Amino acid sequence: MRLALALVILSLVACMVERATAGGVLDRVQSRGSVQCAGFERPGLAAPDRDTGAWRGLEVDICRAVAAAVLGDPDKISFHGYADAADKARQIHGADDVVFLTGTEIQASRLGGRIVPGPAIFIESHALMVPAAAREQHVAEIARNAGICFMSGSPLERSLPAFFDALRQRWRPVPFSEDGEMLDAYNVQRCHAVAGELTALAALRQQRGINNLESRILPEPLLTYPILATTSVQDGEWSAIVAWTVYTLIAADRPAGKWLTGGADAMSAPLAELGMRAGWQARVVKAVGTYRDVFERNLGAKSGLRLPAGLNAAPAAGGALASPVIE
């Protein structure tokens, strides 16, 4: 009986070891010598540098963090943007190691059964931008029947009516099919406000346009939604590595206190069974900084976008990005 039990236990252990060492994606990454990431272009999150063409942004830094975790070098990455049907095929066949997507993008590409919707790396929102001299300080103060510019065919066609219907307030839609035309119309005040993703509005605010118009983004979001670090359903071990890497960056912002562990140790995750070497979390934070560091240099005060952290701050600072912690 004991022998039979021992054989069962050894069999289970062998299965566990086999699973831990299988690591299809990790093996592929280590063989290739780089982590391959992708996402849709968004200012501050993922966009090619105007001078070098190299992709930069918060998503790129998350990719660098994963490379630091599994390869020991944050620069061993490749990043490309998604735009067309060929890119959809790449998603479906798992050609990329980490893909940054919203729920809408997952649904539109019919990827729900093919990817693991991993941790949120950024909470995006739909927002309104008005001239700096406008009287409105809040969205609810937008004048009745005010014209609002937005891109036709975008999710704003749903979020704008839903938001203003909830306020029981009339507004005038001014849709456009080209970004440049919309910006020009706003700059000459053919519409009183412009609606868009928060990151896109921050980039438009920088441009000012032909009339050098200064603008303000109103604080209330029309809609909020996360951008997720997604991975293939075929390799749960890789999904776990990516998730714990993101959580390490978020946990590293936690301040230490009398009863609290701070920094990356707020959620120690050795992950030896997944092939991660000791000290991997410290290497990640050393390579790219904490989540707050990554946010500030790409979207916050140290960037041209100058966005407040808002929901992308830690819960202690009024935000919504949280990681597992040791209570």
Which positions does each model-derived feature cover?
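Beta->alpha turn/N-cap motifs
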Residues: A38-G44, H80-A86, A95-A108, A132, ...
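Extended ligand-binding regions for polar small-molecule ligands
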Residues: V60-V70, A132-E136, E141, N145-P155, ...
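Short helices/loops that flank or line small-molecule/ion binding pockets
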Residues: A69-P74, S78-F100, G112-V116, A162, ...
